[in-house]
């Protein structure tokens, strides 16, 4: 064999080894995007289900739910596949399901909302909390396994509370010894009448909350819920936002220090747009039920109010604002700069993917040091959490040590 032929063979073997070692470009790109955390433009890797610690990943155990909350029973019946379910287009059924979930999994004794206010889906709401718990624990959004559970478990350990979100038990009784470390202080912007984020955050992680809203009726109802649940008392405070044009101003006080802020911003830009969206959801649910061969509604649901009044309803502040989600996020980012040293992490849900780029530009303009985008998925619905901090990594590390 000539020297030229030997050289060609060596080159061929080297190329084959490199080919075997090389990972698909798409996976490499997705992984790098998932870890991007400064001025981060791309999104994280796509997720196809609820968070690994979400108790509702495998659906609902309706027999247990009925046992915990008998008021749910009239709304439960077998679906065409023989599994127990409810009519998710029926607002009374959804409301009864929410109460049962809160009673069974989150040790809430009383929960109710007035007619016309949003009735939130609990699995999706608690998912947001699980992902920001990971954020506080310093876990990348696509981390899975024991390491993630151990680190987030430590958050519960610090606060001497039951860890309600461990997947192996729906109502764990174990309490963790307090290590006399920091307790998580959270701020919920636009809590609504349901107060669902503070309720879940307190019961799943032992966090303490300040919940704000522009609607006095929402604040009144959340206060009523707190008054009827000893588990929430002393852990949830409400503040009324009197200036509808403000987000943080008028809510964050001079001596406040928040580890995390969260928000589910108004989605629509007008009342007509919100109404169209609600009607579209109702029609889609009805079509889906018909396609699956569901039978007519039982007596318990015949007297139900219009579907827009509860599960796809909502007051003005809950569903829409001038400029819609894009403008609300712009206002939030701009105001967050004024409280840069009072909050470790600012976060918000972003429903419309096209609103991310304007947010990135706004965050760069105000000088955010770290920006993260965390994808979430509930069934076919995709959304994401946008998180940003004005503190350097060193300042973030010192945060827990020096804040009161």
Swiss-Prot record:
Coiled coil: none annotated. Residues 1-10, 18-29 have a biased composition (Basic residues). CDD domains: AdoMet_MTases. GO terms for molecular function: 23S rRNA (adenine(1618)-N(6))-methyltransferase activity. It is found in: Cytoplasm. The keyword Transferase applies. Residues 157-172 have a biased composition (Polar residues). It holds the Pfam family Methyltransf_10. This is Ribosomal RNA large subunit methyltransferase F. It comes from Shewanella sediminis (strain HAW-EB3).
């Amino acid at each position: 064999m000539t020297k030229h032929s030997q050289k060609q063979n060596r080159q061929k073997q080297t190329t084959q080894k490199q080919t075997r070692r090389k990972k698909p470009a798409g996976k490499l790109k997705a992984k790098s995007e998932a870890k991007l955390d400064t001025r981060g433009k791309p999104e994280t890797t796509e997720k196809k289900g609820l968070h690994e610690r979400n108790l509702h990943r495998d659906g609902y155990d309706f027999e247990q739910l009925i046992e915990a909350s008998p008021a749910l029973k009239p709304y439960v019946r077998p679906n065409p596949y023989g599994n127990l379910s409810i009519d998710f287009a029926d607002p009374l059924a959804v409301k009864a399901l929410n109460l049962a979930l809160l009673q069974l999994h989150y040790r809430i004794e009383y929960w109710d909302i007035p007619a016309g206010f949003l009735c939130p889906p609990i699995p999706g709401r608690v998912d947001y909390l699980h992902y920001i718990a990971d954020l506080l624990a310093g876990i990348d959004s696509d981390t899975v396994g024991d390491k993630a559970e151990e680190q987030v478990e430590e958050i519960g350990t610090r606060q001497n509370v039951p860890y309600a979100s461990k997947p192996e038990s729906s109502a764990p009784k174990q309490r963790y010894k307090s290590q006399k470390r920091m307790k998580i202080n959270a701020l919920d912007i636009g809590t609504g009448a349901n107060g669902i984020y503070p309720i879940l955050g307190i019961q799943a992680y032992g966090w303490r909350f300040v919940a704000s809203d522009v609607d006095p009726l929402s604040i009144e109802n959340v206060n009523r819920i707190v008054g009827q649940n000893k588990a929430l008392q002393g852990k949830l405070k409400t503040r009324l936002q009197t200036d509808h044009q403000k987000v943080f101003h008028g809510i964050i006080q001079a001596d406040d220090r928040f580890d995390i802020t969260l928000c589910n911003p108004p989605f629509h830009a007008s009342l007509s747009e919100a109404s169209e969206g609600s009607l579209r959801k109702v029609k889609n649910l009805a079509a889906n039920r018909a396609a699956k061969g569901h039978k007519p509604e039982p007596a318990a649901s015949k007297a139900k109010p219009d579907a827009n009044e509860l599960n796809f309803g909502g007051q003005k502040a809950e569903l829409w604002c001038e400029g819609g989600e894009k403008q609300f996020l712009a206002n939030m980012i701009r105001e967050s700069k004024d409280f840069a040293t009072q909050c470790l992490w600012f976060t918000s849900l972003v429903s419309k993917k096209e609103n991310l780029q304007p947010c990135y530009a706004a965050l760069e303009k105000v000088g955010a040091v770290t920006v993260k985008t965390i994808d979430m998925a509930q069934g076919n619905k995709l959304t994401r959490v946008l998180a940003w901090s004005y503190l350097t990594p060193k300042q973030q590390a010192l945060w827990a040590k020096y804040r009161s």
